[in-house]
Swiss-Prot record:
It is an enzyme of class 1 (oxidoreductase). Involved in p-cresol and 2,4-xylenol catabolism. Catalyzes the oxidation of 4-hydroxybenzaldehyde and 4-hydroxy-3-methylbenzaldehyde to yield 4-hydroxybenzoic acid and 4-hydroxy-3-methylbenzoic acid, respectively. PANTHER family: BENZALDEHYDE DEHYDROGENASE YFMT. The keyword Disulfide bond does not apply. PROSITE patterns: ALDEHYDE_DEHYDR_CYS, ALDEHYDE_DEHYDR_GLU. This is 4-hydroxybenzaldehyde dehydrogenase (NADP(+)). Belongs to the aldehyde dehydrogenase family. Disulfide bonds: none annotated. It comes from Pseudomonas putida.
Length: 491
């Protein structure tokens, strides 16, 4: 790496109101490597005063940023893409060390964050107004598409870089300012690293702030604050509901986009290519230890191929290497922290007590939990009802195609889904019957492309990300009329 591209420094500082500084809460956050438990950083936490300064600075800076021409805003996005390329190894290293990502997953995440930033470079020139017909003589009726103003982004720890960039890059490109509250487990990859990248890319001071603070101190205040007109949240359904209540019922009403929990069904119909289905089910479940909102949560297999699928799948899973996420061959690395591990161990015990048949298991080594596969799972078991954010999966038997669809739709969630079949017509018909935001035929449910709508139904959230849908989310219509001739009023 050249001298010009020396690694970013001072990651314990926060970008607040255009300045890198320590938080004022008087308490520190220890950022740990999930695999080694090494302390990576100690960050002085921000308080409500820091948050207020960040939001007010964003409101002030946004006006000039929105007034920049579309080419100027697009160029900042393109500069950021170049920096993603130049700092690829540095970024991937942070993803591995801070979030426990395997090298495979870290490379995927780097590519996804880069892709949405590149897509965002096209957004400023894709914003269009409209001229509407009017029955009022002499009236010209216009609709302008304008930035919302200031966007608050609350990002998760599982895909922190990408799931922050997915809101950040489009929102900035469309003329908004942003304040990020990253997850406490991943403050660098969920915010601070992106702040460095966009600062280097030429984003004006104050347009972006990153506030690292405890949820108990600044969580509700982040949503309640008068400045942001939009809150983008990715995380659990429980927290998302609370954010929705505050945004809709608080003193300052605001728009929300909520990308929440998932319970993705992976359906294998009797005519499926089992080789492909088994391989896909392995990747779709165990990428990033299953800590993905779209990850396979339930495998539903039609009766006539159930036993063969279960046996082949279990044998394939047994061969997966697990352990050190920095090694290129590792497939299953650590879960994010000890609390997450304990919750997964409770779910394993519950699955066994409820009668699920153990096909694959293993003892935890630190925060590394080996893959667990359960067969003969029924819809009333916890492992089928609840989102399992880890390397556990249950397999359900479906009597026929209709029963498979019934099982697929039996969850309160509706984010992503998948179905395997040799008949594309059958697959499309089945997919149209699934109540979810996304369904993939003969592929894994873990898919996200920068020009395609990403979002869920039911308790999986509200709103859509990416492409034209991002324009809809991060801008608003402003109806303006011009009365060219005096209008006759009734009195």
């Amino acid at each position: 790496m050249s001298q010009r591209l020396a690694a970013y420094e001072n990651m314990s500082l926060q970008l607040i109101a255009g300045e890198w500084r320590v938080g004022k809460a008087g308490r520190d956050l220890d950022v740990l490597d999930p695999f080694t438990q090494e302390k990576l950083l100690q960050i002085p936490l921000a308080n409500r005063e820091d948050l207020d300064e960040a939001y007010r600075s964003a409101r002030q800076a946004q006006v000039a940023w929105a007034a920049c021409g579309p080419s100027e805003r697009a160029q900042v996005m393109l500069n950021a893409v170049r920096i993603f390329d130049e700092r690829r190894d540095e970024i991937i290293d942070w993803i591995i060390r801070e979030s426990g990502s395997t090298r495979i997953k870290a490379q995927i995440e780097w590519g996804a964050a880069r892709a949405i930033t590149q897509e965002s470079a096209s957004l400023p020139s894709r914003v269009h107004g409209r001229i509407l017909a009017s029955d009022v003589p002499g009236k010209e009726s216009r609709v302008y598409r304008e930035p919302l103003g200031v966007i608050g982004i609350i990002s998760p720890w599982n895909f922190p870089l990408h799931l922050t960039a997915r809101s950040l890059a489009p929102a900035l490109a469309l003329g908004n300012a942003c304040v990020i509250k990253p997850a406490s487990d991943t403050p660098v990859t969920g915010g601070l690293l992106l702040a460095h990248i966009f600062e280097e890319a030429g984003l004006p001071k104050g347009v972006l702030s990153v506030v690292v603070g405890s949820g108990s101190e600044i969580g509700d205040a982040f949503v309640e604050h008068e400045v942001p007109g939009f809150i983008s949240f990715t995380g659990s359904t429980q927290v998302g509901r609370n954010i929705g209540r505050i945004a809709a019922g608080g003193e300052h009403l605001k728009h929300v986009a909520l990308e929440l929990g998932g319970n993705s069904p992976f359906v294998v119909l009797a005519d499926a290519d089992l080789d492909q289905a088994v391989n896909a089910a392995v990747v779709g479940k165990f990428l990033h230890q299953g800590q993905i909102c779209m990850a396979i949560n339930r495998i539903i297999v039609e009766d006539s191929v159930y036993d063969e699928f279960v046996n082949r799948y279990a044998e394939r899973v047994k061969s997966l290497p697990y352990g050190d996420p920095s090694k290129p061959e590792t497939v299953v690395g650590p879960v994010i922290n000890a609390k997450q591990l304990a919750g997964l161990q409770d779910k394993i015990a519950t699955a066994k007590s409820e009668g699920a048949r153990v096909m694959v298991e293993g003892e935890a080594q630190g925060n590394v939990l080996p893959p667990h596969v359960f067969a003969d799972v029924t819809a009333d078991m916890e492992i089928a009802r609840e989102e399992i954010f880890g390397p556990l999966v249950g397999i359900q038997r479906a009597r026929d195609e209709a029963h498979a669809l019934e099982l697929a739709n039996s969850s309160e969630y509706g984010l992503s889904s998948a179905v395997f079949t040799s008949s594309l017509e059958r697959g499309v018909k089945f997919a149209r019957g699934i109540r979810a935001g996304m369904t993939h035929i003969n592929d894994i449910p873990v898919n996200d492309e920068p020009n395609a709508p990403f979002g869920g139904e039911k308790n999986s959230g509200l709103g859509r990300f990416n492409g034209d849908w991002a324009i809809e989310e991060f801008t608003t219509d402003h109806w303006i009329t011009v009365q060219h001739a005096p209008r006759r009023y009734p009195f």
